[in-house]
């Protein structure tokens, strides 16, 4: 399918994983002419696509020379969320990392902003350097509406009773959050999941994990809860693992999806930049436990 913008064709097609499976979300956008820049696509048009398809991959476009260029581009999407370090998080392995985000660990599924005063609507990722095909490091995305559609009645009943309590200390925050597993999208009312996945049980190598507690269910049902959520969230129709190429741009719906990361080879050339975009108006975090 072609879309014509400023007389320039853009090819749109369903997103597919490396095995050719088509999940129930995601859209691939490719340029219709050599040298076409991402910035030629209207930001509001892309936002509409992201709200409909939840995940956009823009591949093959000319992109951004530096973090400042990416930030200027993101301002067209809406209000950019600022951190103490600025607008852009440099996602690259750090020697002696004190948090799993900056190590080469896997990162379990979660949503961004769960420990902050506001929750961003979108993440914008730009791949500066891609790891090799054998290095790992794919970014994972799971559609929570698709997972809800895949669950059977007993799983749904368990999920609707359960809620999670989480606590985490990191470089820029130390907070507690509590959220029902199943709730309504904060702006659009359809059901979603808010689930922060624990790391592999007993994995002592995982750096700075959150604390996890689940209420509303019997203690012996914890394993059933986690297994059923993982079954549906990692189902090929609900899950997409993205292998990066340099200059890929990914726009993700943080209010609908969960995301994570696969482990990657130590010192692999994996460098992403991430920017958060606020909702309109900015979404005050309903799950943050305020003292």
UniProtKB/Swiss-Prot annotation:
GO molecular function: metal ion binding; oxidoreductase activity
Note on how the cofactor is bound: Binds 1 Fe(2+) per subunit.
Entry EC number(s): 1.14.20.9
Stated name of the protein: Tyrosine isonitrile desaturase
Role summary: Involved in the biosynthesis of paerucumarin, a cyclized isocyano derivative of tyrosine. Catalyzes the 2-oxoglutarate-dependent oxidation of tyrosine isonitrile.
Species annotation: Pseudomonas aeruginosa (strain ATCC 15692 / DSM 22644 / CIP 104116 / JCM 14847 / LMG 12228 / 1C / PRS 101 / PAO1)
Effects seen without this gene: Disruption of the gene maintains the ability of the strain to produce the pyoverdine siderophore. Deletion mutant is more sensitive to chloramphenicol and ciprofloxacin in comparison with its parent strain. This sensitivity is probably due to transcriptional repression of mexT and mexEF-oprN genes. Exogenous addition of paerucumarin resumes the expression of mexT and mexEF-oprN genes as well as resistance against chloramphenicol and ciprofloxacin.
Complex and partners: Homotrimer in solution.
UniProt cross-references to Pfam families, sorted A to Z: TauD (PF02668)
The keyword Iron belongs to this UniProt entry's keyword annotation: yes
Similarity comment: Belongs to the TfdA dioxygenase family.
UniProt KW keywords: Iron, Metal-binding, Oxidoreductase
Binding site for Fe cation: 110, 112, 259
Cofactors, names only: Fe(2+)
UniProt key word Transferase: no
InterPro entries per the UniProt record, alphabetical: AlphaKG_dependent_hydroxylases, TauD-like_sf, TauD/TfdA-like
SUPFAM superfamilies per UniProt: Clavaminate synthase-like (SSF51197)
Disulfide bridge positions per record: none
Catalysed reaction, written as an equation: (2S)-3-(4-hydroxyphenyl)-2-isocyanopropanoate + 2-oxoglutarate + O2 = (2E)-3-(4-hydroxyphenyl)-2-isocyanoprop-2-enoate + succinate + CO2 + H2O
């Amino acid at each position: 399918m072609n879309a014509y913008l400023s007389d320039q064709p853009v090819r749109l097609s369903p997103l597919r994983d490396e095995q050719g499976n088509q999940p129930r979300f995601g859209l691939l956008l490719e340029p219709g002419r050599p040298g076409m820049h991402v910035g030629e696509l209207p930001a509001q048009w892309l936002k509409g696509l992201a709200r409909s398809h939840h995940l956009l991959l823009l591949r093959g476009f000319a992109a951004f020379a530096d973090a400042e260029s990416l930030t200027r581009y993101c301002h067209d999407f809406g209000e950019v969320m600022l951190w103490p370090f600025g607008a852009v998080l440099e996602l690259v392995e750090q020697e002696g990392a004190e948090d799993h985000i900056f190590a080469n660990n896997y990162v379990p599924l979660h949503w961004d902003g769960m420990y902050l005063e506001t929750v961003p609507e979108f993440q914008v990722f730009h791949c500066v350097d891609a790891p090799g095909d054998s290095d790992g490091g794919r970014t994972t995305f799971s559609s929570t509406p698709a997972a809800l559609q895949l669950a059977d009645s007993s799983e749904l009943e368990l999920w609707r009773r359960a809620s999670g309590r989480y606590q985490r200390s990191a470089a820029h925050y130390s907070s507690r959050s509590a959220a029902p597993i199943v709730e309504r999208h904060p702006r659009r009312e359809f059901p979603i999941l808010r689930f922060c996945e624990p790391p592999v049980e007993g994995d002592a190598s995982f750096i700075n994990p959150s604390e996890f507690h689940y209420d509303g269910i019997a203690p012996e049902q914890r394993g059933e809860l986690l297994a059923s959520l993982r079954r549906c969230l990692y189902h090929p129709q609900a899950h997409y693992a993205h292998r990066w190429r340099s200059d890929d741009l990914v726009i993700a719906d943080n209010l609908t999806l969960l995301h994570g990361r696969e482990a990657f080879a130590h010192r692999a050339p994996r460098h992403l930049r991430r920017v958060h975009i606020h909702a309109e108006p900015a979404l005050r975090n309903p799950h943050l436990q305020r003292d």
